[in-house]
Amino acid sequence: RELFDGETLVVRIPTWPRKQGGAKNLILNYLVFVLAGMFCLPWALRGLKFDAILVYAPSPITQTIPAILLKWIKRAPLALWVQDLWPESLQATGFVRNQKALSAVGYMVYWIYKGCDLLLAQSKAFIAPLNDYANRSKIRYQPNSFPDQSTDALVDAPAPLLATLESKFCVVFAGNLGQVQALDCVVDAAELLKDHRDISIVLVGSGSKSEWLAQQKLERGLGNLELPGRFSMQTMPSIFNRAGALLVSLEDDPIFELTIPSKIQAYLAAGKPVLASLNGEGAQVVLEAKAGLASPAGDSAALAANILKIKAMAIEERAEMGRQGKSYFLEYFETESQARHLAETLSAMGKGTQ
C-alpha cells in the first residue's frame, strides 16, 4: 500500500514478472495477475466502498476479471476503458494463430464485456468492433489524453543531438522501436532521402528493433538516420521544439487502422507538424486537425515524398500546422479536460444516470 500524491491509496498485488519475454512468461504474467487479483483485492479493499470501478485496459483484457468479481462484492458499477481489441490484436501480432483458440478468446471477451456496465472506446473506430461483442447502448467514446507540457521545466538534450537538430531539417520519431512501428518503411524512406544531406530522420527511443536499426544504418550507409537512444520525458519537449516535423508510423494491418497511437496526442501537444505513415483513425486525426501530412502505411516512397513536401513549405506554413494541431489537442485530448469528462461519466454511472 502507498499514497499517490499524498492522498490517493494505491494497493499493489503480486504477479509473475515478464523477465526477458517469451510466451511462457507472458502467459504466466497474465494468469498470475488474474488469480492474485481475485484472491488479494477483496481482502486488501475490505471495508471500503466505491461509487464506481474503472479498468484501464491495454493488453491483456483478462485484467478485467478481478474487477468483475469486485463489482459483485462491492455492488459498484464497472467501466472498462478499452485500449486494445481482443481477439483482433492477438491475431494481428501473430501471438495466436489458431482459429479455435481465437474463437475461444472471442467468447471470453463477450463474457467480460457482458460483466461491464460501460465500455469506453479510446478510438471512434473501436465502437463498431466493440458492438460485435456488446450492446451499443453501453459503449462511449473516451479518447486517451496527454498533459499540456508547455509550461513544464525543460531539460536539454545532449549536445551532439542538439547540434543535429539545429543544423538540419530533422524528422523525429519518439517512442517504442518495435515490430508494429513499421520501421522498415522508415529506414527505406531514409535510404530514398540519403542524397538530401540537409535532412535527418531521428529515431528517439529503444525496443526490439534497436539492434536491427543500428545494423541497417551501418549496412546501408545511412548517415541521415540518427539513433540517439532513450531520453526522459523532461527532455522530449526540447527535442520536439527543434524538430522540423514529428513522425508516427504503424504497420499495414486492419487492427491498427482502428487505433490512435498515443504519440499522436503528444505530437499535437508539442505544436509541431506531424507526418503520419499509417492508415485509418490515426491518419484521420492528423488530417482532421490540419496538423500535417499522411501517407499509406508501409509506403516508404510516399513517406519520403511527404518529408520533402513538408520541408519545402514556408516556415510560417509549418508553424500554422503546429498551431492547428495544438488547438485540436486542447479541444479533444488535453488531460485536465478529459479527466473532468471521465469523472463526470463515472459519476453518472455511479448514480445510474449514464
Question: Whereabouts are the PLM-identified features?
Answer:
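Conserved donor-binding/catalytic core segment of Leloir-type glycosyltransferases
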Residues: 162-181, 187-191, 202
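A short, well-ordered alpha-helix in the C-terminal region of glycosyltransferases
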Residues: 309, 316-331
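Carbohydrate-associated surface elements
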Residues: 125, 142-145
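Acidic donor-binding loop of glycosyltransferase active sites
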Residues: 117, 240-257, 272
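Acidic anion/phosphate-binding donor-loop and adjacent secondary structure
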Residues: 145-162, 182
